Amino acid sequence: MDHQAHGAGEKKGIMEKIKEKLPGGHGDHKETAGAHGHAGTVTHGAPATGGAYGQEGHTGTTGTGLHGAHAGEKKGVMENIKDKLPGGHADHQQTGGTYGQQGHTGTATHGTLATGGTYGQQGHTGTAMHGTPATNGTYGEHGHTGTATGGSYGEQRHTGVTGTGTHDIGEKKSLMENIKEKLPGGHGDNQQTAGTYGQQGHFATGTHGTPATGGTYGEQGHAGVTGTGTHGTGEKKGLMENIKDKLPGGHGDHQQTGGTYGQQGHTGAATHGTPAGGGTYEQHGHTGMTGTGTHGTGGKKGVMENIKDKLPGGHSDNQQTGGAYEQQGHTGAATHGTPASGGTYEQHGHTGMTGTGTHGTGEKKAVMENIKDKLPGGHGDHQQTGGAYGQQGHTGTATHGTPAGGGTYEQHGNTGMTGTETHGTTATGGTHGQHGHTGTTGTGTHGTDGVGEKKSLMDKIKDKLPGQH
């Protein structure tokens, strides 16, 4: 641990020394330090057994937070952990903020770690916070746990992570960006410009229940995540955008213009129960999600748009301009019961979702438009002009019971969605087409005040189904 490290200069962190010589680790990183730098890390527990032809069996790390470390140039904990993994190449530029940019703490592992696989980076154990969380520094980011990987030829079976969030001023990368950015196949140039006086970062996430079982040749079986949202002013990525931004096949150009007076970010999502079993060659078996919505002013993406925006086959250019004084965002969705089993060659078996609607003023997408906007086959450019002082949005949907069984070569087995609920057994999907959709009901829109053009609930449900453009 580095406690009360004083003075300026350039030095290497503990994790940088550990990871510096691992195979295939290449990366150029630039950081301009703020004040009160990053804490060191330690490892606990039995390391995993290595496999073959790859880097396997790395244990997690723990840190105590930040303790009066003064200015200088050094790397963060998560950057050091993931910086040298095979296939991870990226150029990063960060410009420090003011008044206390503090670094990220590490993670802790407890118990027996996983056994490595072959021909790739496998067998990294997840880390969990059991007992005493990391010790606070000053306005620092602490208590983040790691992730677990396993399977073959791809990044599979990642569990969620938990944390308490970040509290400081200045520009930094979110937790999920640090976790996903250096995994095999993750390449990206990231540039962030710091805000001032209160740009607070993204909260961590967590999973509940049994994560999904990964398939092959793709990223499958990711469990849901939970979070409480972000708070502050400035331009930043949403939680789900960070999670999905680097998935295979996920391409998109996004432009966001920040608002003023409290642009607060997106909440995470959570899964309960047993997630669906993954299929093959695509991303399958994603469970539903819940969230509390977003509050604040400025341009931002909805929760569901962030979730679906980067799925394989989903390509879009999204432009949003923030409103003013109370643009409140979209609520998430939740699934209960047993999700559907995934099919093959497409995205199948998605369960229904619930939400409470949107409230506020400004330009935003409705809940159902966000849900259906990026499904395979659904392509469209959307432009909406926000109303003023009270355009209240559409209610979400919920499904209960047994979802339909997925078909093949298309998107099948989607359960019906209602403004209120659906009960009973849904239809069984067929083949080579979109089959088995149950009927939908809606309650309409309530309390629409002000000026603006918007679609009804049922239009949003039906507008973006595959084959309808």
Swiss-Prot record:
- Which domain of life does the protein's organism represent? Eukaryota
Residue segments, region 7 X 23 AA approximate repeats: 9-390
As for family, the record states:
Belongs to the plant dehydrin family.
Q: What keywords were assigned to this record?
A: Repeat
List the residue ranges of the region (14 X 14 AA approximate repeats).
Answer: 49-441
Q: What induces it?
A: Specifically induced by cold temperatures.
- Biased segments, Basic and acidic residues type: 233-254, 302-312, 361-382, 451-469
Per the record, which residues fall in region Disordered? 87-112, 203-469
sequence repeat locations:
9-31, 49-62, 72-94, 95-108, 115-128, 135-148, 149-162, 170-192, 193-206, 213-226, 234-256, 257-270, 277-290, 298-320, 321-334, 341-354, 362-384, 385-398, 405-418, 428-441, 452-469
Q: Is Repeat tagged as a keyword?
A: yes
Q: Where is the composition biased (Gly residues)?
A: 288-301, 439-450
Gene Ontology terms describing biological process = cold acclimation; response to abscisic acid; response to water deprivation
Name the gene for this chain. Answer: CS66
Q: Which residues form a coiled coil?
A: none
Function text: May reduce intracellular freezing damage during winter by hydrogen-bonding to the lattice of the nascent ice crystals, thus modifying the structure and/or propagation of ice crystals.
Naturally occurring in which organism (per UniProt): Triticum aestivum (Wheat)
Instruction: Print the domain comment field.
Output: Contains 7 A-type repeats and 14 B-type repeats similar to those found in maize, rice and barley dehydrin and rab proteins.
| Record protein name field | Cold shock protein CS66
Biased amino acid composition, Low complexity = 93-112, 203-214, 255-274, 383-402, 412-429
